Amino acid sequence: MKRAPNHPAELARRIGIASEDLATLEMALTHPSFVYENPQAPPEHNQRLEFLGDAVLGLVIGEQLFVRYPTWTEGELSRRRAAVVCEANLADGARRLQLGAWLKLGRGEEASGGREKPSILADALEAVIGAIFLSGGIEAARRFIVDLFGDALANAQNLVSGDNKTAFQEWVQRTGPADIRYCIVDESGPDHDKRFVAAVMVNGTVIADGQGRTKKEAEQQAAGRAMREWAGRKG
């Protein structure tokens, strides 16, 4: 993925950040590696905003789960919140916003495919949420988060933190036995920087695919996407 050529004002308009807060958005898109490799640049990177955005995200998702699922215990709410805001879901949301194209990365991260790394994308999304909160307050942040995580919130009862494959299997087999299989459909990159694409099939039909730096990561992402797709089909 190449860096977006345009000023982040375009992204700011899309996500609801005021024009006078563009500097905050730029900070949210600045990875620490860029600052370390460019000492002449402004010293701020996105880690503090990531901290703030993580707190805002946790609050909003917790609030939504509390209201939508009134019979859940504290433990159930905590587990499902962790599942909704897991790295895979955060990275998926960042990809839908095409945040990777807007990131400022150091040369090393750029060369190693940093614009596609789930951890970097997840951190950037949290930082952007922090920027939205500072620009527009909790209501603006809530609108953004609920819109971006709407599918995950609607399907929260079927999510299990850390193991999408198990959760998907349990969800599918509620309606009876099913043959669930995962296969690697694409593999690219040098040995030190592999990328895998996995597909998940139910009874021979491809439901979703996912990608990752390991086969396991790709399969987990495929399962997470498949849960949302399967829930939509059965809903």
Curated annotation (Swiss-Prot):
Name recorded for this polypeptide: Ribonuclease 3
InterPro entries: dsRBD_dom (IPR014720), RNase_III (IPR011907), RNase_III_dom (IPR000999), RNase_III_sf (IPR036389)
SUPFAM superfamilies xrefs: dsRNA-binding domain-like (SSF54768), RNase III domain-like (SSF69065)
Enzyme active site: D54, E126
Signal peptide: none
Keywords attached to this entry: Cytoplasm, Endonuclease, Hydrolase, Magnesium, Metal-binding, mRNA processing, Nuclease, RNA-binding, rRNA processing, rRNA-binding, tRNA processing
Enzyme class at the top of the EC tree: hydrolase
Organism, scientific name: Heliobacterium modesticaldum (strain ATCC 51547 / Ice1)
Catalysed reactions, semicolon-separated: Endonucleolytic cleavage to 5'-phosphomonoester
Domain RNase III, residue spans: 8-137
Pfam entry (one): dsrm
Family: Belongs to the ribonuclease III family.
Cofactor(s) this protein requires: Mg(2+)
Gene name for this UniProt entry: rnc
